[in-house]
């Protein structure tokens, strides 16, 4: 009988099976802080691998983009169709300080606006704010029936659409060029630009549901910690308070010992 390996006899491997390490044991949670122009400042939490050698945790967090519903930021369900993008700019302690990085409208809201018997008018323009942010703003609007109109449809002529589009661009440029990014975001929240476009174009053709549907940041200025702290307003890191020592507990004066 030939001598060989008996396959039926299983031998134990050296060292045994390695225990799988929990990947979360090497990670830390950080709080995401929204700018002070929003009511809710604590957006949520994010994970990052702890600092190991040359890999610094804070560097891995910078420039992360978080998408948050405006309803959560403003504690108002009326804003649930808006999505705000926030980008991580700096890390202080366990807090990630963010800044506005774009805006969008949910798909279901956009689909609900598009209907028959009306004209859809869109315009977009590139603008630069006073603090050197370059943005691309997209506007959308729909025609509506005039007062006492019997006709079922409310289609605008191509010449009227061109005029309305020109007016949309003009208003978006004037509104953005005269303020900084923080002030511009404060105009987006109550949809004041959309209402102004409705008023300005009413003489050409009455409009309804005029929205700044999307905002993209094309170019941002060089990072400045001072500007970021202005955006976050009253934010300050948790530090100890300096206490005054009572007069009777004054530190003893140092005495020099001669010959020591």
Swiss-Prot record:
Coiled coil segments of this chain:
none
Major location (coarse) = cytoplasm
Localisation: Cytoplasm
Report residue spans for region: Disordered: 1-22
The record's listing under InterPro entries reads: Ribosomal_eS1, Ribosomal_eS1_CS, Ribosomal_eS1_euk
One cellular component (GO) term of this entry: cytosolic small ribosomal subunit
Q: Where is the composition biased (Basic residues)?
A: 1-18
Q: Which UniProt keywords apply?
A: Cytoplasm, Ribonucleoprotein, Ribosomal protein
**This protein's superkingdom?**
Eukaryota
Can you supply a Gene Ontology BP term from the record? translation
Q: Name one GO molecular function term.
A: structural constituent of ribosome
The UniProt similarity line reads: Belongs to the eukaryotic ribosomal protein eS1 family.
Could you describe the subunit structure of this protein?
Answer: Component of the small ribosomal subunit. Mature ribosomes consist of a small (40S) and a large (60S) subunit. The 40S subunit contains about 33 different proteins and 1 molecule of RNA (18S). The 60S subunit contains about 49 different proteins and 3 molecules of RNA (25S, 5.8S and 5S).
Q: Which PANTHER family match?
A: 40S RIBOSOMAL PROTEIN S3A (PTHR11830)
Q: What name does the UniProt record give this protein?
A: Small ribosomal subunit protein eS1
Which species expresses this protein natively?
A: Helianthus annuus
Gene encoding this polypeptide? RPS3A
